[in-house]
A protein has these predicted regions:
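Surface-exposed cleft-lining segments at the edges of enzyme active sites
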Residues: 59-61, 142-147, 173-181
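Structured beta-strand-rich core segments of catalytic domains in phosphoester-bond hydrolases
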Residues: 64, 83, 89-167, 264-269
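Metal-dependent phosphoester-hydrolase catalytic domains
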Residues: 160, 182, 195-204, 209-317
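N-terminal, active-site-proximal structural segment of metallo-dependent hydrolase catalytic domains
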Residues: 27, 33-108, 120-125, 286-314
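Metal-dependent phosphoester/phosphodiester hydrolase catalytic core
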Residues: 162-184
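Glycine-biased, low-complexity coil/linker segments
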Residues: 14-15
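Active-site beta-strand/loop signature of hydrolases that rely on acidic residues for catalysis
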Residues: 49-57, 72-98, 132, 159, ...
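Cytoplasmic C-terminal tails of single-pass
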Residues: 324-342
Length: 342
């Protein structure tokens, strides 16, 4: 009897120990899955060198008074820019011969493009800003700015770009040109809300701001943004007008010094527009891509399954243990009963 009791006790303990090992192993798999799955969607992101341009193209009208989109495209190609913010872009207007400038520029440069119309029914077409990009454009939206008075409608064109397995928010704007800065300052107050929609993304804010570095507008923007020219620009950086530039009113603003390192900034000479282009080379670290709905759904399913495995095994062990005890008791091999007899 004692021998049978010892054998029954050993068999039960062996099964329990084996069950505990299985539970521990499954818990390890669950932890491993929890650590591994989010990482599947966020690979290591290495910095990339970007060449960025902002350019008020004056509907492709040069200093000679001729509309010539090929001259604009040539300026862009020669700069080797990866991303371009364009202002004063016409689409199908009478004054430019009905040319679809955004589509034509995309064809001439071999880049992706999005267009933001700030004026509809203008000269039989549209007028606004555009963004050219060598990188895929994942989404874009043109925000019409509120105004304090009657005047030309202004806007902020934002595009989320897929850069080196990460993301960048690229923004183009063209603010009011009047001597009174009130409208420009009012426009600036609306920027915070627009960028809050993409708070997790590093951003570039480019365009024709129609104000100088000594202005109140520049002072306000400098509290949240970094002027690329102030980091690496040489000489005066004047961009307006192109024949004899006297003012710096075109800017490339950086949202964070953490994600951006400005290598150099330059103002190439050209007579293709009344503005000169502003070009910067920037070392950029993209933001990791956020996990999308399909990936989140997959993560939830997998983690649910992984969590269920140890629970199921534990339940099986408990049931098996109770069954073994019952069988041992019925056969007279219950270790507790055996021990009490000696």
């Amino acid at each position: 009897m004692a021998k049978r009791a010892a054998l029954g006790s050993f068999s039960l303990r062996e099964k329990v120990a084996e069950g505990r090992m299985r539970v521990s192993f499954c818990l390890f798999l669950s932890a491993l899955g929890l650590a591994w799955l989010p990482g599947c969607n966020s690979p290591d992101i290495t910095p990339v060198v970007l060449r960025v341009m902002t350019y008020n193209i004056h509907h492709a009208e040069g200093l000679d008074g001729k509309v010539d989109l090929e001259r604009i495209a040539n300026v862009i190609r020669q700069s080797n820019a990866d991303i371009v913010a364009l202002q004063e872009v016409d689409k199908n207007t009478r004054r430019t011969g009905g040319i679809d400038m955004p589509a034509d520029l995309a064809r001439r440069t071999g880049m992706n493009i999005v267009f933001g119309a700030n004026l509809d029914n203008f000269q039989g077409g549209q007028y606004g800003t555009a963004i050219l990009s060598r990188f895929p454009i994942e989404s874009h939206e043109n925000h019409l700015l509120k105004q304090t008075r009657e005047g030309e409608q202004r806007g902020v064109l934002q595009a989320v770009l897929a850069v080196n397995q990460g993301q960048l928010l690229f923004t183009c704007t063209h603010l009011d040109h009047k001597a009174d800065p009130a409208e420009r300052l009012f426009s600036e107050t609306q920027f915070t809300g627009l960028f809050a929609r993409h708070a997790g993304l590093p951003a570039l804010l480019c365009g024709d701001f129609n104000d100088t570095p000594a202005s109140e507008l520049h002072k306000r923007l400098s509290k949240k943004w970094t002027d690329a020219w102030s980091i690496a620009g040489k000489s005066n950086g004047f961009t307006m007008g192109s024949a004899n530039p006297t003012r710096r009113i075109d800017y490339i603003w950086l949202s964070s010094k953490k994600n951006f390192r400005v290598r150099w900034v330059d103002v190439p000479r050209s007579e293709a527009s009344d503005h000169l282009p502003l070009v910067a080379e920037i070392r950029f670290t993209p933001a990791p891509r956020p996990m999308g709905t399909p990936e989140l759904a997959l993560l939830i399913i997998v983690m649910t399954l992984l969590s269920a495995i140890p629970i199921g095994i534990a339940a099986t062990i408990i049931i098996s243990s109770r069954r073994n005890k019952k069988q041992a008791f019925e056969s007279g091999n219950d270790p507790n009963l055996s021990n009490s007899q000696f």
